[in-house]
């Protein structure tokens, strides 16, 4: 039996993976869900928990939960991005010389160890789904990954008993997933990857199956996580103005608030309004008060405007680096879960024309699907990358 190679999109907020079976991408699943939160809970005793189980721990034990480890993977302690991440991290992030460690209880964990817990969980789930031992993988990385990221993700994979056969830029993997390689066209492409923690723009020249990056630019602190943070701040601000209560002071309640904002954001991607409720969210005069609101999409979009402005700045900069105007771009592919936010799609369509902009129906899985397609080059009989057929809607 041929050894299975899996393709992994190790994301800031979520991780997903899959492999090729025939010409079909089969996805790794955790209780039928192919999108696995990149969240790790480190208990006082026992094994770590990864994914949705860890997410549920955020509300009760935020100081033992690590989110968005990708943001500091491979970075040195003096980096300004690290300082900003540490200020909002549940688990305490400290510097030891030029190294970073999470202090959780009486133990210390390097970011690579936390990342390895996620990769190890992916490997275990893949072995359960596909059978046999899995030890090899293709891993994607941000087009704007910091210098130390490559070595750090390789070390994390080794801890998780995985050998990385190929590191591929996320925009290239995304381009494969949306089928841009299915034509022999020669054209200029723009791939916009709006994920949970980063926004990357890549200008690419396509000649059939050959994709040549011309320019790449990104914002490492702009993603769905940041939209969630702004959402939570907006709700907390409204509460403070009306009742004088400071929701930031209760770490557990604010963690719950942020979680509920994330869930509401997802609903607003397909609806113009959504209910927002949170029981005993804050206290006034010693008495608990709940939040019961209807959130209109335009209301939160106005509060997200500075973030969208930053995204457009990234697009303008990558066009400048490539020496292109919007009219020079033949196709724009939107990938990453945050690209499903309607206002972002509207802004990009206004800039390039709606007919040239495509949004992957599996935007949150596009990069992992592309990575899975690339495993075709590493099987027992290497072959060309096929056009994507996905099992997103298939039963587990």
Please place each PLM-identified region on the residue numbering:
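Negatively charged
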Residues: 121
